[in-house]
Amino acid sequence: MAKTKAEHVHEVFESISDNYDKMNGVISFQMHIGWRNDTMKHMAVKPGSKALDVCCGTADWTIALAEAVGESGEVKGLDFSQNMLKVGEKKVQPYPQIELIHGNAMELPFPDDTFDYVTIGFGLRNVPDYLQVLKEMHRVVKPGGMVVCLETSQSEIPGYRQLFRFYFKYIMPIFGKIFAKSYKEYSWLQESANDFPGMKKLAALFEQAGLEKVTYKAYSGGAAAMHIGFKKIR
C-alpha cells in the first residue's frame, strides 16, 4: 500500500536528523541564516512574549525566538520527528524558556488564542495540507498576534526559476549523497519544494486561513520567501 505524504515525510526526517543542520548550510550556501535573521527583524519580537515554532525540527528558529523573548518569555517548539527533536533537545539546554513537544502541526495541542507569535520555517511544504496548518496557526495565535512562514518559493524572474529547479532536482540530491549519504531523501525534498505554491498563492492561503494584513518578501531572487499575517482583533 502506498504511503501517505505524512508517513513518507516522517521517515525522511527521522532518517536525516543527524545531518540536517549541516545539510541546511550546504544546500542554501548558509543563506538560510540571513533569511531567518531578516525575518526576525521584521517580526520585532517583544521581550516577555509567548511564541510557538511549528515544525521546529532541530530548533534553530526556536532558539532565535527564545533569545528574542528573553527569560521572561516562553517558547514552544513542536515537531512530529522524535529524532529531530532529540538533536534539538541538546541545543536548547541553555534556554529554560524553551519546551520542545512531539506533536502534529495539523492538530496543534494548544488552546485558542495562546501565543503572540507563531512561526513555521521550511516546514509548511512538507505537511499534508498547507491550509489546515495555517488555520491551526491562526487558531492558536492571540488576536492581534503574528503568524510567520519562511519557506522555499517559486521565483518570478525569467530563467531563474528554471535554474532554481535544476539545482533542487539534480544538484541538491548529489549534495545529500556526498555529505549525508541520503540521496533518496533529498531527492524527495526537492519535489516538495517544486510543488510548493509561489508567493502570491501562499499569501492567498494566509487570507483563506483567516489572517489579515498579509505581506511577503522574496529572498535571493525568490528562492525563498517570508510571509507575515495577523489575527484580527475582535
Swiss-Prot record:
Entry protein name: Demethylmenaquinone methyltransferase
Gene3D superfamilies per UniProt: Vaccinia Virus protein VP39
Family that this chain belongs to: Belongs to the class I-like SAM-binding methyltransferase superfamily. MenG/UbiE family.
Highest taxon, organism lineage: Bacteria
Pfam family, one: Ubie_methyltran
Family annotation (CDD domains): AdoMet_MTases (cd02440)
NCBIfam families assigned: MenG_MenH_UbiE, PRK00216.1-4, PRK00216.1-5
Claim: Ubl conjugation is one of the keywords in the record: no
UniProt organism field: Lysinibacillus sphaericus (strain C3-41)
Binding-site residues, S-adenosyl-L-methionine: T58, D79, N104, A105
Molecular function via GO: demethylmenaquinone methyltransferase activity
Keyword Transferase attached: yes
Biological function: Methyltransferase required for the conversion of demethylmenaquinol (DMKH2) to menaquinol (MKH2).
